[in-house]
């Protein structure tokens, strides 16, 4: 596992070539759909192309190191949370009341590699493994 982790960290260094950019988050949705929400998200509007360019840079670096990558297209978003099947009704109500306009604006100055460890009833624990500041 350690050689793969080292290769992933090396690929992450490619993100340092990205420039800082402004990001606007607006509009909410759900994966796989709003009728069957499992993940709630806020979409990235302004700054989405910069996010996609950074993701493509990382994809290329990972692919070059032999990692098998997802085939589905990257969709820039901020995950709000996961929905258990029994919480579907509440998630649908939340989607209906969250405003559709601009919800947040920030400057993105870097990316983090995160480690997520599932913890049963308490949910996942997320830890920053390494930060990759943008130029």
Q: What label would you give each PLM region?
A:
Residues 1-135:
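Histidine-dependent nucleotide/RNA phosphoesterase domain, centered on the 2H-phosphoesterase fold
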């Amino acid at each position: 596992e350690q050689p793969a982790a080292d290769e992933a960290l090396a690929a992450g260094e490619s993100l340092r070539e990205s420039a800082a950019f402004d990001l606007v988050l607006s509009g909410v949705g759900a994966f796989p759909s709003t009728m069957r929400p499992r993940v709630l998200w806020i979409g990235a509007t302004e700054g989405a192309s910069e996010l996609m360019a950074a993701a493509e840079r990382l994809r290329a670096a990972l692919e070059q190191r032999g990692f098998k990558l997802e085939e589905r297209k990257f969709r820039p978003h901020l995950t709000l949370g996961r929905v258990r099947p029994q919480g579907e009704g509440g998630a649908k109500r939340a989607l209906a009341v969250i405003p559709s306009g601009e919800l947040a604006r920030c400057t993105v100055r870097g990316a983090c590699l995160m480690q997520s460890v599932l913890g049963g009833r308490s949910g996942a624990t997320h830890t920053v493994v390494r930060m990759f500041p943008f130029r």
